[in-house]
Amino acid sequence: TQYHVVPKIVYGAKAYHFSKKKHNSYKTIMKVHIASIPKNSEVFISVGEIDCRPDEGFIVAAKKRNKPIEELISITVKEHLKWFSEHNKDQNHNIHFFNLPAPVYDKKLDKVINANAANTVALFNMFLAQHIVLHDFNLIDVYKFTVGKNGFSNNFFHIDNRHLSPKIITEIEPQIRNM
């Protein structure tokens, strides 16, 4: 089967934005993207990396709200998947979610902050794997290929401190073929 790849980007989107009941611009843009893709298409979605950064998202919210980070991540992952499921009903896309790559150890930050970021990514991926099966979505695992010592990036697939290089495609393609 031949496929035509068309990137659709929602800049700055977090899983958090899709987990909230209230309307927001991220949801609007994503709805337009979902509707613009021919029905019954293979759709790949990657959100959550920004949510797991040490200076925003779950780590900051857990401190501010004095709530366990596990609770925030679990609810956010569950609700954002539910949002995508609801907005895919009319389109009937086969949706594939990427989990998060292991974070690159940031030498500008101390060990505790780096450990918190690595733990947050691991928790996000764990809850994503748990909740994704409830929606008949597929999981593309990039974490297992990017994780090295202590939960941090092995620096083989990262092109910079946050983004993966095209080298990761050799690990993604077999996962897609086996679905």
Predicted regions located by residue number:
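Substrate-gating cap/lid alpha-helix
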Residues: 105-142, 167-169
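Histidine-centered active-site loop/cap adjacent to the catalytic His
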Residues: 134-138, 154-179
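Acidic carboxylate-rich catalytic motifs and surrounding loops in phosphoryl-/glycosyl-chemistry enzymes
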Residues: 96-101, 136-154
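Surface-exposed, active-site-proximal loop segments in enzymatic domains
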Residues: 54-69, 105-113, 153-157
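Conserved SGNH/GDSL esterase-like catalytic core that processes O-acyl groups on lipids
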Residues: 1-79
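Alpha-helix N-cap and loop-to-helix initiation/capping positions
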Residues: 64-75, 112-123, 159-164
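Active-site segments of SGNH/GDSL-like serine hydrolases
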Residues: 48-51, 60, 84-119, 144
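Conserved beta-strand segments of alpha/beta enzyme cores
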Residues: 2-7, 94, 136-138
